[in-house]
């Protein structure tokens, strides 16, 4: 009991403050029961799947915090595979650490940020907590735009500085370079420090002027100053006081030995400040020289003055109309007015500027005797402290604007204290402090308006963070020491000036008046793994391009989806096509405009691409009863990558649970040599490494090459355990041995095919008998013709309408111009590569590097989140088969959910549905006819196409059984150019079915025309490829059982989502688990798979559903 209380106390204390687990020993010492979990997370087995699954199973904040910290080490491509589940958990199982992780990865990848936005948008439309989801969505948007780390889609072009803001642009560019230098490693030598011509180069490669070069050289800090600024994150509070002296000694050090250069620089400073014409240069030089004598007597040492202040103060203090002459003639009076104290004079709007020069060049006669005795104090509290010093007891007095346009400098009304409230007091005013109303300038005073606009932007660059104001106010009220530390010019000020990326999120303009981010208990501390990168500035061009790309990409996808939604109400079909063409033309015009704001990201596929055009003649309207999906081609350009970007070979590999994307980019491994039937084995694979034992290869080869002439075959299966020995057991019959493990005591599945002993010689089938014979079941083609004939007479079977609702009857008829299918004909009418070359030749972007063509389907009106889940599960089955080395073939595709009723779907090139193949070619009445015409019967390519068909049939049959995928008519079955079959459209799975009636009760679709391709028939006639199909189904099912929890848990995470497939409630997950038959032995599982195949052989319900689709929707 005491131990339990102690553990609970420890857990309670850990929730009070954010935690960051740096070593596993800390958590192990807190709770011994969690030690194994931490060791598991730190092992090499840790991956994206483990992270997501344990985030779902564990509610403890400590476990979640540790998992989120560990997820930072995982690749973004793997995280993107489970982004759908992560966003769902973030909404329905909230955690501060998970929120922060999602926000951080949004800052690293534009595609992830876009997908997070769309996933949250879909949840926002279904959830009651709209405010909470909107808040997270806005934070992700800020992270992706203002503090994004991803490279812009286009290289930002340097904008030329306008004549009205040369001074400000010069300062901004110098300040940005100063930030990058102070935050770069001191050991790196930049070209900017070189005295050669390389130092005169700007970012775009253009030459700097001589004045600009001097300004920049003066702003470059020494390596010691950079070292002092780099320690800001690691310094403790107790070390701040002792390090401050050294910090400002280095920052304000004297540059002795440069008196001549300083004198020339300062002399040039006031020459340009008060210059009227060339004849007055000598007089102004003498005045400025006398001024510096007074300055040196008050300070005791010389401070370096940068020439950057030349143009700045000249613009700040000059009059807008012809005041340069008056400045030249009355320069002596200017300095008298500049340096005198006037406590009883009226205060004018420009008193702040005059107060600045008073503070900057104030004569302090009382300090003449202290110059030699307090050198260190002068270095610490000298120039910059006077320059940036801030007064807290602020007085607000009304000001009046002088009616004339001839005066620039006015007299002061405030005393010595108000005189200090000058230029930099206004510059460093807090962000949330009320701004006094000084008055309005005259309409003709254009320079005053220009000055105020630039001044507000200049002050915003150095604004103080609101949290700093909150933390410094108590100390300011308590003692004067707090004022010294937090006022501008001190070390704390500079530490806050170069604040972290996380602070700049809250300081952004888009964050507005929203609440600042609260640190919730249990959230991990922010990690700063890249201190050498310069912090992003909200005003630079790269940030503007990121913001533009993010919003333009969202608008682009929204316009595509809304087009599909609006086409529903347009009739007839010709008007619908015209409207779609006009909409595409309008989107193309928007694409051209988006090029100036950063470009539009193509959100699908592997890699980062920028959308440049949509060919207007390449759209296709797809057949649908109630919706109007359409297919388009999109021209894209590969996004520009920064120099030095690492390219790894891992990008070509499929991640765990990843989806092969982007129209043929799927990296599908070739099957091992033992997967080939003996008669079709290719020579190229004979020398490759074998993945299974020799006995397994021999057994499968024997099973595949066995030509049985008996009509009925009995299958006898048994599981045997053999010790590791070199002896081989030989059976008298035809024996197939399947290896199921690699342990020392191996388990073998023995498959024996024997003829029925009751058969006589007369029962032996004649080998010359035609392969496709008629049998007791009515052929699909004959039955369909009978139904069509009855419909023509006004008769129809019960429950079937005479015509498809809303469908053109021409869909069921062969094409008028359809010819005979030949071996070289493209299934889709045109090969994808030929289409790609044709469009590239006609496109104005075709000659640009990185050009590519993508094809997508835009769909609206359906919630495609269930289809996204189905494709994700198929990708997991794909990984399971690949890891086991099995040749079962699957082709996942990408479904990108953009809302609860819209989605973008990847198209699979060079494919066509069985329905479209039969409709296009009159000579094709069955799938066997298609194979005979396409691949030439009995040719090597025909055998290879048969093998591809069997491998894909076995893979999809298991998936359809385990996930209970329904609505398997020929419109949802595709064929590719290599003979693979591909399933699409997973709107009915797990517990729902078309019409709410489970009419398709067979485990999977295995009709006669599918069996004919495997040289079998509706009775299950044994053949080489049909036996191969059985073996693959047995191997695949035994392998899937080992990963059952991986599939079940992925589905269980979303069981409360309200998807149609979960309408069965908790029984949905229970039935899914039952279909894996985890309680059966492997021998029993073999018999189970064979019984599933037998139950699916040309099942009556499956055939009747095909008849129904043919009559109702014209699907052949």
Swiss-Prot record:
Residues 1-143 form the PIK helical domain. The gene is PI4KB2. Belongs to the PI3/PI4-kinase family. Type III PI4K subfamily. Residues 836-842 are annotated as: G-loop. Residues 394-404 have a biased composition (Basic and acidic residues). Sequence repeats lie at residues 210-229, 242-261, 264-283, 286-304, 307-326, 329-348, 351-370, 378-396, 418-436, 452-470, 488-507. It catalyses: a 1,2-diacyl-sn-glycero-3-phospho-(1D-myo-inositol) + ATP = a 1,2-diacyl-sn-glycero-3-phospho-(1D-myo-inositol 4-phosphate) + ADP + H(+). It comes from Arabidopsis thaliana (Mouse-ear cress). Keywords: Cell membrane, Cytoplasmic vesicle, Developmental protein, Golgi apparatus, Kinase, Membrane, Phosphoprotein, Repeat, Transferase. One of its GO terms (biological process) is phosphatidylinositol phosphate biosynthetic process. One of its GO terms (molecular function) is 1-phosphatidylinositol 4-kinase activity. Pfam families: PI3_PI4_kinase, PI4KB-PIK1_PIK. It is an enzyme of class 2 (transferase). Residues 210-507 are annotated as: 11 X 20 AA approximate repeats (PPC). The keyword DNA damage does not apply. Acts on phosphatidylinositol (PtdIns) in the first committed step in the production of the second messenger inositol-1,4,5-trisphosphate. Necessary for proper organization of the trans-Golgi network (TGN) and post-Golgi secretion in root hairs. Together with PI4KB1, required during polarized root hair expansion and pollen tube elongation. Functions redundantly with PI4KB1 upstream of the cold response phosphoinositide-dependent phospholipase C (PI-PLC) pathway. It is a peripheral membrane protein. The PPC (Plant PI4K Charged) region is involved in membrane targeting and phospholipid binding. Its EC number is 2.7.1.67. Residues 830-1101 form the PI3K/PI4K catalytic domain. Residues 394-417, 515-540, 794-813 are annotated as: Disordered. This is Phosphatidylinositol 4-kinase beta 2. Residues 964-972 are annotated as: Catalytic loop. PANTHER family: PHOSPHATIDYLINOSITOL 4-KINASE BETA (PTHR10048:SF22), PHOSPHATIDYLINOSITOL KINASE (PTHR10048). PROSITE patterns: PI3_4_KINASE_1, PI3_4_KINASE_2, PI3_4_KINASE_3, PIK_HELICAL.
